[in-house]
Amino acid sequence: MTVRKTLTKKLSFACVALAISLLAGNAAAVDNVGFVYVTPIGDAGWTYQHNLGRVEMEEATGVTSSYVENVAEGADAERVIREMAKRGDKVIFATSFGYMNYMLKVSKKFPDTAFVHATGYKMGDNMGIYNARFYEGRYLTGVIAGEMTESNVLGYVAAFPIPEVLQGINAFIQGARSVNPKAELRVIWVNSWFDPGKERQASMTLMSQGADVLTHHTDSTAVVQAAEEKGKYAVGYHSDMSKYGPTAHLTATTHHWGDFYIKTVEQVKAGNWKPESLWGGYA
C-alpha cells in the first residue's frame, strides 16, 4: 500500500429534532424513557451510538431512562415495547427497522405514550419515525475508498437488502466512481445486523477476491479488524472504529443521536409533541 492520502475525514450526522405532541397543548410528566436495542451495546456500532444519545438525553433533561438490548426483530420486540408502555414510560424509542409493525401495534393500545421508531416508514396517531440520510456520508467515504484502492475492487459486508442498506451501497460505489471510474464493488449479505463471525468470514472472502478497501452495514467491528489483520483498508460505519484498525481504518460515517433524543423528550414534556417523519441530513 502507498502512504495514506490525507483524505480522511470523520463524517457525522446530527439528527435534527422531530416536532412531536401527544396531548395537544398539555404538558406531560415524563418519569422514564424506554429504548429498545437490536444488538448488544458494546463499545462501537449502531446500538452504541444510540446509547450514547440516551445518556446525553438523561444528562440534559434530568429524565431517567432504561433500555433492553439484543431484542430480536419479532414477537419479543412487541413484548418488550408493551412492557415499557405498561409500566408508564411516556416516550419509547425503538431503534431497528424490524420493530416497526410491532411498535405500531402496541402504540394503538397506549394513546398517551409517544412511540418513536428509527428507520421505518409507518406512522400512527402517536407514533413518529426518524432516520438520517446516511447515503450522503456513504458517498463521501466512497470517494475516499475510490482514491485509496490499488486493485480497483471494493468490498461491502451488508446485513439485509432493505432500502436504507441499498441506498448506502449505491452511494458508496457512486462516490468511488466519481474519482475512479474503474472501481467495482462486491457485496456479501450476512442476513444479520450483528454476527461478528459471519462478518469476518465475508470480509476474508471479499479480500480473497481482490478487495483492498472494505466497508460494512453491520453492527460489529469485525470488518475493520479483518482488514487490519490482512493489511488492507477499511471504512467504518456508525462509530469511529480506528482503535480496532489503527492502520486499516481510513474514516467512518458516524451517527450522533443525542440532540434528537433531547429535543424529543423536551417536546413531550412541554406538551407540543406530534408524530412526524424526520429524515435528517447535511442540508
Describe each PLM feature range.
Residues 2-15:
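Bacterial N-terminal signal peptides that target proteins for export
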Residues 29-283:
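A residue-level marker of the well-folded mature domains of exported/periplasmic proteins
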Residues 23-29:
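Sec/Tat signal peptide C-region and signal peptidase I cleavage site
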Residues 13-23:
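Bacterial N-terminal signal peptides
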